[in-house]
Design a protein with these regions (language model features):
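C-terminal and inter-domain tail/linker signature
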Residues: 1-135
Length: 135
């Protein structure tokens, strides 16, 4: 597990930029292979139970996903950085009729590459017990 020690502001901003660019290329441009080769390190630890470790497993999984869901899109709501960690809070939809999922993705960056990933995914419900949004 990574340290949450404070990093240099310039490093944190560079990590946030790197993760945002990776996400845009992989999930909105639907280029997971290109994104993985450009932004993921040679050792990639995956904590999502549906995706194996390694960059090849990542892009194989998402190439198939985008063939099945060609209108899939994400909207990044927040980007937070802490040391070598970058956190994205986003809305993910498979198509324009989908209510979507609220996702929190956590990435660990090392030497300018993404080397580890965690996520938490929650369906956006049809009805809510309150008037707040998930974002």
């Amino acid at each position: 597990m990574s340290s949450l020690a404070a990093g240099k502001p310039a490093d944190i901003e560079a990590n946030k930029k790197l993760v945002r660019e990776f996400y845009e290329m992989a999930f909105n441009q639907h280029k997971p292979t290109e994104a993985a080769k450009k932004y993921i390190g040679s050792k990639y630890i995956q904590h999502n139970p549906h995706v194996p470790n390694g960059s090849e497993a990542f892009y194989s999984y998402f190439e198939k996903h985008f063939k099945e869901n060609p209108k899939a899109h994400v909207e990044i709501k927040r980007v937070l950085g802490d040391g070598d960690l970058v956190v994205l809070h986003l809305l993910s939809k498979e198509n324009e009729k989908d209510r979507g999922r609220a996702i929190v993705d956590i990435f660990r960056v090392e030497n300018g590459k993404i080397v580890e990933h965690w996520d938490v995914i929650q369906e956006v419900p049809e009805k809510s017990a309150n008037t707040n949004t998930m974002f």
